[in-house]
Amino acid sequence: MDGMYLYNLTLQASGSVNATVVGQFSGTRQQEIIVAKGSRLELLRPDTQTGKVDTVLSHDAFGVIRSLAAFRLTGGSKDYVIVGSDSGRIVILEYQPKTNSLEKVHQETFGRSGSRRIVPGQYLATDPKGRATMIGAMEKAMLVYILNRDAQANLTISSPLEAHRPSAIIHHIVGVDVGFENPLFACLEVDYSDSDHDPSGRAFEEAAKTLTYYELDLGLNHVVRKWSEPVDPRSNLLVQVPGGYNQNLEKWDGPSGVLVCSEDYITYKHQDQPEHRVPIPKRLNPVEKLSERRGTLIVASVLHKMKNAFFFLVQTEDGDLFKITMEHQDDEIRSLKIKYFDTVPVASGLVILRSGFLFVASEYGAQLLYSFQKLGDDDDLPEYISTDYDENGAGRRRPQLPTFTPRPLDNLVQVDEMPSLDPILDAKPLNPLAADSPQIFAACGRGARSSFKMLRHGLEVQEAVSSDLPGVPSAVWTTKITQQDEYDSYIILSFVNGTLVLSIGETIEEVSDSGFLTSSSTLAVQQLGQDALLQVHPHGIRHVLVDKQINEWATPSLPNGRQTTIVATCTNERQVVVALSSNELVYFELDMDGQLNEYQERKAMGAGVLTMSMPDCPEGRQRTPYLAVGCDDSTVRIISLEPNSTLASISIQALTAPASSICMAEMLDATIDRNHATTFVNIGLQNGVLLRTILDAVTGQLTDTRTRFLGSKAVRLIRTKVHGQAAVMALSTRTWLSYTYQDRLQFVPLIFDVLDHAWSFSAELCPEGLIGIVGSTLRIFTIPSLASKLKQDSVALSYTPRKIANHPNEQGLFYVVEAEHRTLSPGAQRRRTEMLGKELKPHQRGVLDLNPAEFGAIRAEAGNWASCIRAVDGVQAQTTHRLEMDDNEAAFSIAVVPFASAEKEVMLVVGSAVDVVLSPRSCKKAYLTTYRLLDNGRELELLHKTEVDDIPLVLRAFQGRLLAGIGKALRIYDLGKKKLLRKCENRSFPTAVVSLDAQGSRIVVGDMQESIIFASYKPLENRLVTFADDVMPKFVTRCTMLDYDTVAAADKFGNIYVLRLDGNTSRSVDEDPTGMTIVHEKPVLMGAAHKASLVAHFFVGDIITSLHRTAMVAGGREVLLYTGLSGSIGALVPFVSKEDVDTLSTLESHLRQENNSIVGRDHLAYRSSYAPVKSVIDGDLCETFGLLSPAKQNAIAGELDRKPGEINKKLAQLREGATGF
């Protein structure tokens, strides 16, 4: 195989929401939310009963989604969604509940692909009556499409009508509510034509921002500019105001028009209507410098209509919500009112549901669902009304800005949270827990809501009850007494010499009149038929009827008089099969009268039976037709239970080891059959391997066997229910759960103690729980969410984290540097308070006493920084030490260095700067601060500070010394008594050193704008020499060495690429002991003498913030793990065989043709957004193969000379074998 080939897999999708719409997309009364997360569209369905949000659908569009808008045709009951993307096309999607998919209804091309400033797609607005839509670009271009129905009542879309305005920058577009008059769109725009022709710059300073109305004349099929009015030059957002005459209620819905949100003010504007303006109350901040104060902007808004009224919620950039109401007489406005409502995280989108919920799509971090407790009408907070000011507040003299102090939630209460890692600033995969797979330690979040997270692959478990038992049970069951019971009534525990029966009520207590035999251990418990119970014990079967009458069946005796025992059994609601120690199977079936009848013949197996299973009886059927039996000759046999071939053998499968447990379960997997559940036969082996095979419902043959190693312990399987669906638990050295999520079968470990046995549990206080045994302890627990496969353990941080470093010897100990711009540090707050010269009363302190985690840090002017260094125990999830930085010093880099000159003592070095200006990058002073680690690294002690000449952006340990990227210089420092000693430097780097990695004496340097530069340290001459670089300039964010000659790097535009040095160049550099030959080589293309060649290139679509070479599964190959700024986690898996490369690249090319992007983006062009994709296969695209129709799957598989099942199996092996996800 020539060169390197990689397979890209997304392990955790982006969590950053950039667009949100609400509507009745299913066509029912229930409202749903569609959110855009990078290249992914998700349909969320809030449960109005529980207040939980379920992710119903997640679809990768393979294109950048820029905007969303929902509309409904007049008289329709179903909402459609319009998508603006980087495809140069407008796309209308319809949600199909039957297939749980988004279907493309219309796709119209209007421009070039890519996110360009004059190609529409950035802004979308619809007419409130669903008659037209406007799609706009950042500059000049605006198109209007008419939406209508044809004779068959299908949605139609017209040709585009141009509403272009040359030399105009567009800031926002919104549809104006005019009832059934000609559709009207409002645009916020700036004309720069005069600025282009004025060399003095005066026209640029005086450029006016205008509110312009564009009218679509439905009669003439033409768009005209109807009205234009200058607005505040700092206006940034338009909000639609209800309007139009309501024929049903015989009254006006509202005054129509728009609210123009600008800095500190909100203004109502409409043609031929008086202006009304209200101020946006500002937070009371006594230490703010009023001369440098930055005004308050509105960043999100939502309109909510009720039967006879409407109101708006608008949100400022601090997260404060304000309620805006209007008084109007018919279609004329009387007054505009504003009032503080509550404070929530800053949102990219707000949605109010009719059921009384507010969905907050947070700009950073988790998405939140709140419930309205009240509408804030009855509290004593002041309300500001436009009529209280001169000229309704719209005169030349603007209303004075009132102040307020935010308070904890009063009108809202949080009911659900959808966790998100967005943004990830830095991450490290390590394994301090010594688990099967590494944990990812990530620095996430922004501002005071930041956190340091330990991410573990698995489902989170919430424990409800933990109780000690008198002994160690071998098994546990729960059962209802009758079929109609809503909840379980009994918990049955089997011990070596007896059985304990507990009743489930307000308390759990022992019962003696259950009818069960308690003097013997139990093998199985089943609720049988309508109202009977069944107990299988080693010496027989006990059938307990509803009137407590007991029917017994005893095991038969052998010819020598010894009684046989039951060694294995399986049951369902209507059937019972037991295996005797004489290697015979005995079959029982429930008749229509509720009697349990034994089938006359017994089946001799010819080998000892170890385990067996049959699925639940299908609804409306008398019996299930198949039984799986595992024997001690390492085979599994499928036995028929049909009346005409009872206990006849159908098929046999050989195993690599004897079976320890079998579980048959009917579960839905859309990659196998999207319409019906598939019968899976799960076989756990004694060597810790799990086999999953499919039982052919017609022939009874076992097909498509997949294997997975679970641990060193024999596997025990239990059929259970999770979130109302069939699931299978596999118990080995870890507990695993097989379940269906979004119509795909998942197999994920539980983050919980190792269970010895488990069963489903349903009680009034815990309706969807599970019960398990850990040693002699009984545990009752729930799985709150199946949506996320990563369990998050968090430590709260004070400011935005910048970099993390781990202690090399103390497992799980990390150091985080945090820095926040435009924020006052505690020391600066104290100094400014003292400068006021007076004691502030409680009501005057305003934001000084607020909790930053809830309300955000105290805002300050540009150039103010708050920063700290924190030692974190990642495993225990606690801060062990925190060091606040003062004097406007901010930390940007960190490294743990074992200095050779100090007998390998581990020191912490932090790179920081004072009075940092971000653009252009500058600082007053910069330092490398060295800390001694005390208490095994849990505390820090300042050793000394070393002043340097630029901001240290990256630090790294290197051969017992410190390697530092300080501005354009790369330096090596050693430890001195009073400061760090500069030993060596190279100042030839073009922009700034932002990333470093090293092997031996070779160093790879990531430059801020000029890609990767290879350097070598020559100890004889104590010299750092650069000898190779990249041909193309790239804005590097991270780099890591894959081997001595190969480096993987990522840039600011979402690309990952791999560079490799020529072998001869590499050898000649190493063979030159002084570096003099390299120094005198002729530079090529104004750079280094040698050029690295590009091996692989791929557009991920997210800015990469960490790159690491690591093995994700025990004994698995190493992969390149990356994390993205928007919360995504992915892996690039290297291929090991040419056959796999050929198969999957052919599959990828077929899927590019078959699987059209729902936004109309060409897949190859998307993955080659900045440079052509090279040597990387898109695993996310390949995995959509299972979602194609069976006919398409067969056609593509035929081209590859394979069956669809084999391709799905290969894709699953690549994902599970390399990443474990």
Curated annotation (Swiss-Prot):
It comes from the Eukaryota. One of its GO terms (biological process) is mRNA splicing, via spliceosome. InterPro entries: Beta-prop_RSE1/DDB1/CPSF1_1st, Cleavage/polyA-sp_fac_asu_C, RSE1/DDB1/CFT1/CPSF1, WD40/YVTN_repeat-like_dom_sf, WD40_repeat_dom_sf. Pfam families: Beta-prop_RSE1_1st, Beta-prop_RSE1_2nd, CPSF_A. GO terms for cellular component: nucleus; spliceosomal complex; U2 snRNP. SUPFAM superfamilies: WD40 repeat-like. Transmembrane segments: none annotated. The keyword Translocase does not apply. The keyword Cytoplasm does not apply. Its main location: nucleus. GO terms for molecular function: U2 snRNA binding. Belongs to the RSE1 family. Associated with the spliceosome. PANTHER family: DNA REPAIR/RNA PROCESSING CPSF FAMILY. Involved in pre-mRNA splicing and cell cycle control. This is Pre-mRNA-splicing factor RSE1. It comes from Mycosarcoma maydis. The lineage of its organism: Eukaryota, Fungi, Dikarya, Basidiomycota, Ustilaginomycotina.
